[in-house]
Amino acid sequence: MQNVLRDNQMIKKKGDVQLTAIWLPVLYLLSFIVCSDAVRFSFGMDLSFLFVLGIIFFYFAFYKNHISKASFYGWWIYLLIVPTLIMCLMKDGDMGHMIHCTLIMILPIVLEPFIPHDDKTISFGLYFVVGVSLLLLFLYANFGFLGNWNTNCMGYLLFLGFAALTVLLSKNRKNVWLWVFYAYAFVQLLVTGSRNISIAVIITALLVLLKGPISKKWVYRVIYTFAILYPLIFPWIATEMVGTALYEWLAEITETIYDKGQGGVFSGRPKLYLEAEKLIGESWVHYLFGYGRTMVSFYAAHNGYYVLHYTYGLIGTLVIVGALIYFFEKTFILINAGDSISYGCFAIMISVLFQQASEGWFLGTYLITLMPFVYMAIVIKRYRIYIQKRKNENGKEKDE
C-alpha cells in the first residue's frame, strides 16, 4: 500500500501551525474542570452530564455535513439526548447514569471536529498538552497542588496528559529529550501511589520501542486482543496468585514503593470480583442483558469488564468489544500506511485497556478524563481524511 500519510501528505495546507492546535490542551484541561471527583463533590452534581450534552449539541449545530454522511450515529445520539435530559433531573437515577455512560461512548465521534487536520498542528497541540501535564505533575508532586484530590484520579488525569509524549515519540524515537521528559514524568507519578499508572507508563514505552515488530498485522492483533481480554482474565489471575511466592515478592514491592501493603497486592480487589460475579450471575436475564443501570452508582468492582457486564449484560458487552475491535482494525490501516500519530494513539489505548483490569473508569462509568476519547477521535479524524484521499486518488486514476 502506498504510504499516503507519510511526509505530511495529510496536511490540507502546508505552512504555519493552525489555530485548531489549541483545542487539544483545552480538552485536556476540561478534564480537570468538568470530569473530576473534586468538581462533582464541590458542586453537588455531575457536571460531565452537562458537558456531554453540550458537546453533542455543538456537533449537531456546527458539523451538519459530517452528520449527513453518518446519519446512523446522528440519529442514535439524538434519540439518547431526550431521555438523558429527563433522567438528569432525577437525583441519583440509575437509568440516567446508564444513558450518561452510553453517551460517553459516543465522545470519540462528537469530539472529532475539534481535532486538527494536519500532522504539524496535531504535534504542536500535543506538545502543549505535554507541557501543561508536566507542569501540573511538578506542582502536584513537589508542592501538593490539588493534593486533596483522589490519588488514582489524579494519576489518570496526569498520565493521560503526558501520554501525548507517546504519540510524539512514535514519530521520533531518537529524540533524547522526549525520553528524558518521559522518564521524569514516570518518577514523579510514583507520588500518586498508583501501580496501575506505573504499569501503563511502562506499557506505552515498550510499545513505542517495539514499534517495528508490533506493526506486523498478526502481532498487532494479538496485542489488542489480549488487551481487550485482560480485564476478563485478571480477576482469575489475582485470585490464583494469592499465597504464592510471586505474590509475596509483589507484596514487598507494594509496601516499599507504593505504601499500600495493608490491602495486599491487589488492595482487596479479589473479594470485590467475587461479589461482582454474584451480582452478574444472579439470573440468566441479568447475565445476558444486564441490569440497565451502572454498578458504580452503588458498588465499585474496580474492573472494566464487570462494570460493562453488570450494566449492559453479555450481549451489550460483546457489542462494545466489537466496536473496539473495529476501531483497532481501522487504526491498523493507518499504521500500515505509515501514520506514526495513529500508532501513538494505539499505544495509549492499549495502556488504557490494561488499566481496566483493576479499575473501571473508561467505559460504563462516570467520565473521569476526556483524553482516551480525544486520542480515539484523532484516529477517527485521520481515518476519514485517509479514506477521502484514497477516493480522490482512485477518481483521478479513473479519469485518466
Locate predicted features.
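Loop-to-helix entry and N-terminal half of a specific, functionally important transmembrane alpha helix
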Residues: L24-L30, I77-I81, T331-E359, P372, ...
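Transmembrane alpha-helices of multi-pass inner-membrane enzymes
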Residues: L53-I56, F346-L353, F362-E400
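Long extracytoplasmic/lumenal interhelical loops at the membrane interface
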Residues: L146, K260-I315, I320, N336
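Hydrophobic, aromatic-rich transmembrane alpha-helices
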Residues: N3, D7-K12, Y28, F51-H66, ...
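A membrane-periplasm/extracellular boundary helix in multi-pass inner-membrane enzymes
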Residues: V187, V191, L209-Y258, L279-E282
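Alpha-helical transmembrane segments of multi-pass inner-membrane proteins
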Residues: L107-V110, F114-G144, W149-G212
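Aromatic-anchored transmembrane helix interface
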Residues: L47-L53, A70-I86, K91-F114, C153-L157
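Hydrophobic transmembrane alpha-helices and their immediate junctions
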Residues: G15-Q18, F62-Y63, S71, L314-L353, ...
